[in-house]
């Protein structure tokens, strides 16, 4: 590991602290080093507030040290005026002689302009240190801005013989997730801006789709209910957090419920993506079920990663689990006795 890589890893570590609040901005971390010592560091905490570079510079107790320092930043410093002034201008104004950048910002208003501005000011700029890891940090930001849709994560648990649940019209579902996996799901929910289920899952499982076993904000709850036949006593309609209902009916919104009319004679998933991108500005989406909903996302290529918990339980019959497309590479690990499969969409 080189010296630059060591400090860039710290940038990445810092950036992840913004996972719940930085969106729709990307997660970014910055570290300022002089004579082999960190003299300042920061990350982008919340959209509309100071960027990572601003917070790192503000943390330096003696600004005179900046004249001989290097600033490491996981993403190219911005060069345009948004909700805050350009970070590239701040770096130039503070007289920092060297900048190390993890990856170029793909956002059209930046896209290399920040780096060029720094170089035009006579600053030494190194680009591409731990580039893959730094791009990993901003994958949701990139997907949202380039594909015009949320970054989509699919999640389900299935039995050892490939079923999501027994066939039932009511009653309790078979418990497949371990307590630790349930905790991991709540962490995942806290990191998402919206969470979606189909009508059958909402009816039979009556999920809350809230964050209860982890710290964080509740995501926007989404449910597909074509005919508006879901009973109002379900947890989705309890008012604890907003819910958006996709339907073919026309219905006025309430304080806690928003109804979005779709053309169910056409493919509804692209319509949902348009609503989430253009109207709701949702950058990340977690799809929790059920089987038909998950399979529809898979078949239409509307997914970016999937987490599948393979339980030890066998059901012998029931609702078949979704099938991942062929050619997808997965990594596997054990968690609390269950086999977890993590797959990234290979396009």
Give the residues covered by each predicted segment.
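N-terminal pre-triad scaffold of radical SAM enzymes
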Residues: 69-79, 147-158
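Proteins enriched for Cys/Gly/acidic motifs involved in redox and nucleic-acid/cofactor modification
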Residues: 21-22, 129-157
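Zn2+-dependent cytidine deaminase-like catalytic core
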Residues: 32, 37-133, 220, 296
């Amino acid at each position: 590991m080189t010296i630059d890589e060591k400090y860039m890893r710290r940038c990445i570590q810092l950036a992840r602290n913004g996972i719940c609040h930085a969106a729709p901005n990307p997660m970014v971390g910055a570290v300022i080093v002089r004579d082999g010592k960190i003299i300042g560091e920061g990350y982008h905490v919340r959209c509309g507030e100071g960027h990572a570079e601003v917070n790192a510079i503000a943390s330096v107790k003696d600004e005179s040290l900046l004249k001989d320092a290097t600033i490491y930043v996981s993403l190219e410093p911005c060069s345009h005026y948004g909700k805050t002034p350009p970070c590239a201008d701040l770096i130039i104004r503070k007289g920092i002689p060297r900048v190390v950048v993890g990856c170029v910002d793909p956002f059209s208003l930046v896209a290399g302009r920040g780096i060029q501005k720094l170089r035009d000011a006579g600053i030494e700029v190194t680009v591409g240190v731990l580039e893959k890891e730094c791009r990993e940090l901003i994958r949701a930001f990139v997907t949202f801005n380039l594909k015009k849709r949320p970054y989509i994560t699919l999640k389900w648990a299935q039995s050892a013989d490939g079923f999501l649940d027994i066939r039932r019209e009511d009653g309790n579902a078979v418990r497949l997730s371990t307590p630790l996996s349930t905790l991991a799901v709540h962490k995942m929910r806290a990191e998402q801006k919206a969470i979606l289920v189909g009508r059958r899952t909402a009816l039979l499982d009556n999920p809350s789709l809230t964050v209860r076993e982890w710290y964080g904000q509740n995501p926007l709850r989404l449910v597909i209910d074509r005919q508006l036949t879901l009973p109002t006593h379900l947890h989705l309609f309890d008012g604890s957090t907003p819910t958006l209902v996709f339907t073919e009916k026309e219905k006025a919104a309430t304080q806690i419920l928003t109804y979005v009319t779709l053309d169910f004679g056409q493919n509804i998933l692209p319509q949902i993506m348009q609503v989430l991108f253009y109207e709701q500005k949702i950058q990340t989406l977690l799809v929790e079920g059920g089987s038909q909903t998950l399979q529809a996302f898979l078949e239409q290529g509307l997914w970016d990663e999937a987490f599948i918990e393979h339980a030890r339980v066998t059901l012998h019959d029931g609702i078949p689990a979704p099938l991942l497309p062929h050619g997808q590479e997965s990594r596997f690990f054990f968690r609390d006795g269950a086999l977890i499969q993590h797959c990234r969409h290979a396009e």
